[in-house]
Amino acid sequence: MILLALTSNRGSRDFQYFSDKQQTRLFEEVINTAQTWAENPLEQLMFVVGATQGEMFIDVRRVAPKSFLLVPGVGAQGGSLESVAKYGMIEGECGLLVNSSRGIIYASSGEDFAEAAEREAAKLRDQMSELLEKAK
């Protein structure tokens, strides 16, 4: 099951950062509650956390330290792959599934679309590989 936790859109702060009397923010409550639904949360749950959230990955990892995170928003939406890796990776593992759609599919609108998309995908792949190597 993949659940929205903390999205990249500007309006997300209107709701996802809302906190209750115990100062638990909505995105934290979503993660905490969802983990009670699954027999094996680490194998059955993944949480969507937008790449534009940067240091907020620290708070997400506090409530979901080993969970896989689906991370959209790298590239065209302005999310930093370096910040995602720095604050979101699990020590000794990765724990991230990074998605960059617009940065790749809109690399060119010309006849060189396929080549431009391939270049952008390869560039992102190489950046990810470099960050994974550093994390070892």
Placement of each model-derived feature along the sequence:
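Conserved anion-binding
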Residues: M1-L45
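Surface-exposed amphipathic alpha-helices with a cationic face
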Residues: Q35-E39, V60-A64, R125, S129
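Generic structural signal for well-ordered alpha-helices
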Residues: F27, I31, F57, L81, ...
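Short internal beta-strands
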Residues: L4-A5, N99-S101
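Generic structural signal for well-ordered, non-membrane alpha-helical segments
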Residues: Q23, F27, Q53, Q77, ...
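A C-terminal functional module that forms or caps the active site or interfaces directly
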Residues: F47, A51-L97, G103
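Short, small-residue-enriched loops and turns at beta-alpha junctions
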Residues: N9-S12, Q77-G78, I104-Y106
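C-terminal helical cap(s) of enzyme catalytic domains, especially alpha/beta-barrels
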Residues: S83-E93, Y106-K136
